[in-house]
Amino acid sequence: FTKYEKNPILCPSDGLKDFRDPKVFRYEPEDKWVMIVSADKEMRFYDSKNLKDWNYMSSFGEGYGVQPCQFECPDMVELPIDGDINRKKWALIVNVNPGCYFGGSATQYFTGNFDGTKFICDNQPNVTKWLDWGKDHYATVCFSNTSDRTVAIPWMSNWQYCNIVPTKQFRSANALPRELGLYTQDGELYLSAAPVAETKTLRKENKE
């Protein structure tokens, strides 16, 4: 590894302080890279051909869902609807802190379309969808190169109290990885998150 002499490769043009947590993925239809960056109360989209020179494309998030102090750790994946690979939508995952329904930080998501430049949400701005209703679920990110499935893993804690939890060697832990999918219910599209099948190998015996 050789540190790039022209770092940082991307800075906010408006001098924004909360500009971080970049997620980069390959957008094959246009043979380019796309980067999503959390920028205060929105996510900004950039593209690049060489991973060094980045161009601003669009933003999304302001006024949508829960409007917290800040958005963090964005991610976005394209998923089949109800298992049908011929019908797909994008899921934009956003971690928010604070102001969540059950207190502190949590993970919300938006479903919609992405044309390589701009994300268009399916729902109205006042609609909020939570990825997990557990209290300790934050900073959800997806793995790359997981073949024909999408696997995500969250941080198992909450900014409401993580700094006062007694600890020595580490600050909390990750939750179990889960496989993501899109499903319809009553005409509405939702993101499912089920523990990956590999977790079954951790079970050694059953007790009634």
Set out the residue ranges of the language-model regions.
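Conserved Ser/Thr-centered positions that define the repeating blades of beta-propeller domains
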Residues: 1, 45-51
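Hydrophobic core segments of beta-strands in well-ordered, beta-rich domains
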Residues: 5-14, 18-46, 56-64, 77, ...
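Surface loop/turn signatures of beta-propeller and other carbohydrate-active proteins
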Residues: 1-26, 37, 55-78, 118-140, ...
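Short loop/turn segments that connect beta-strands within beta-propeller blades
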Residues: 49-52, 114-116
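Gly/Ser/Thr-rich phosphate-binding loops and adjoining beta-strand/alpha-helix segments
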Residues: 81
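Beta-rich accessory regions
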Residues: 85, 111-208
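Structural motif
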Residues: 42-47, 100-111, 163, 176
